[in-house]
Structures are given as C-alpha cells and as structure tokens.
Regions:
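Intrinsically disordered, low-complexity repeat and linker tracts
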Residues: 1, 27, 157-160
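Positively charged n-region of N-terminal signal peptides that target proteins for export
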Residues: 1-5, 13
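Hydrophobic membrane-insertion alpha-helices, especially the h-region
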Residues: 9-23
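Membrane-interface motif at the C-terminal end of an N-terminal transmembrane signal
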Residues: 20-33
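Tryptophan-anchored aromatic micro-motifs
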Residues: 31-56
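Contiguous, well-ordered beta-strand patches that form the walls/edges
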Residues: 48-52, 70-144
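Post-signal-peptide N-terminal segment of Sec-exported extracytoplasmic proteins
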Residues: 50-70
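Short, low-complexity, Pro/Ser/Thr/Gly-rich segments in the mature regions of secreted, periplasmic
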Residues: 148-160
Length: 160
C-alpha cells in the first residue's frame, strides 16, 4: 500500500467515527422528549463521584404536562399503572402542590405551584438512552427563596 492510500483509509475511518459519534450524541441529546411521557423515574444526584443516598420519584403523565414528584416509590409506581391511576394520585397530591413538566431538546423542566407560587428546576444538557437519562447540571428558581445553578450530575432511572 502506498502512503497516500493509508492516509486516505485513516481519514475515512476517522470521518466515520466522527459521524457515528455525532449521530449518537444528537440522538441521546434529543431523545428525552419521546422517552419520558407515561413513565416513572427514580432520580438521585452524584457530586464529585459520590452518590446521594436520598432518592425522589417522578411519574410523568402520558397525555398531559402533569407530573407527580414524591419520596414514596409505591405512590409513584401506582401513578404509572394507568392514566386513570395517575389522575387519582395527581388529584390527591395537588391539594398541597401541583407539578408540571416540559421536555424539549436536551432540557427537562419541572415546575411546582404551591400557594400560588411557582418554583422551577431545569435540567440541562440531558443525555437519554436505554431506560435512563442524566443531566450534568441544573438551574433552579425557588419561590421567595432565590435562584441558582448547580453543577451536579442528576440521574433518572426508569423503574416501571
């Protein structure tokens, strides 16, 4: 083989790797929109390589922008059984606070309305594949408490 042929083959292989990697990244960064409706996720954080032992659960409605956020795994799983069960659990939870969600591109936003005050958490740089998605950071705006950004990995694992 000539030197020119070897360089051409190496360049073609590198180009194929870049295209494949870019395609996977695009898929993973835009797939969350399709994967969360109608499912239940356990989410927890990871800071400096250490997992947080506290977990929360979120159930996403299949047909609306409603969400249920709870520390009770059985309540979240019950909400994930059917849209009818979801509405029952949502109605009970919304007596104190109601949750909504929006997923677009590589962002997921959870909003909580409590006492007519809105608090929001926006998970940025979301990568989704398999039965989980993760975010490398999130921003928050808490009613009457302030706002900020947290550079902490959040992992959402599908449990239903």
């Amino acid at each position: 083989m000539t030197k020119r042929k070897i360089v051409s083959i190496v360049a073609a292989v590198l180009l194929a790797c870049v295209v494949a990697g870019g395609s996977f990244y695009y898929y993973a960064s835009h797939h969350v929109v399709k994967m969360i409706p109608g499912h239940v996720y356990q989410y927890s954080s990871n800071l400096k390589g250490k997992d947080n032992s506290r977990s929360m659960y979120v159930a996403f409605s299949e047909n609306s922008d409603k969400a249920i956020v709870t520390q009770d795994k059985s309540e979240a799983l019950k909400a994930g059984q059917s849209e009818e069960q979801f509405e029952k659990v949502y109605k009970a939870q919304s007596k104190t606070a109601s949750w909504k969600y929006k997923a677009s591109g590589n962002k997921v936003t959870l909003g909580k309305v409590e006492n007519k005050q809105l608090s929001q958490w926006q998970y940025n740089s979301v990568l989704a594949f398999g039965k989980h998605f993760s975010s490398s950071n999130f921003t928050y705006q808490i009613a009457k408490a302030g706002q900020g950004q947290v550079k902490q990995k959040m992992t959402f694992k599908q449990i239903d």
